[in-house]
Amino acid sequence: MPQQIQDVLDAFSPVLKEYRYRNFWSMEIRVKDDAAYFGDATTRAPMPATPSNLENIKNLPEVIYHGAQGQLVQPYYEKKFTGEVLVNMKGDRHAWGVTEVPEELKRWLKLPNSCQIDSLRCFPPDEQHGEAIGWLVAIGDTVEEVIATMKDQIALLPDGMSADLEPLGELLTVVEQAQEKGIDFPAEVPPPETVLVDNGT
């Protein structure tokens, strides 16, 4: 684990211990030169990342349970890579949204702030988050496999729902630029244009 992360955890640990804190903890640390800048302490499961963890860490309940007792358990991952994209749904912010999720997507489509009524997924009015309703998750042993799976999943989204792979392409561009500056990545990273949808949707 990078020293910058350890330093922040060491600083917070006494306070968290005093309160017997047993919940999730995530944060942002920006590093420039030798200095680390801490921000965004988050005392909940992180979003994105949690949908990927739910589907890719096979022993997640054990990791959480034993972690709450102070015992570290090594996570076991089903696949090497995961990806998430934001899912949007068109509709009136002041009215309920309703859709039927295809069986093939039920494991991979994470829809917080909604409820299931019979076969329908229902979304209460939400003026805060616009059209964003959740996350689409894909896992794979290569980055290309994750992208290909996501393209197939997007094609299965019900009418009125959409997901955009463009942010993933922007991320691949950042990786490509980092590689040009000599930063090594342990896996082969495809070119950004890989995310272009070619399934006719």
Task: Locate predicted features.
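ATP-dependent carboxylate activation and anion-phosphoryl transfer catalytic cores
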Residues: 1-201
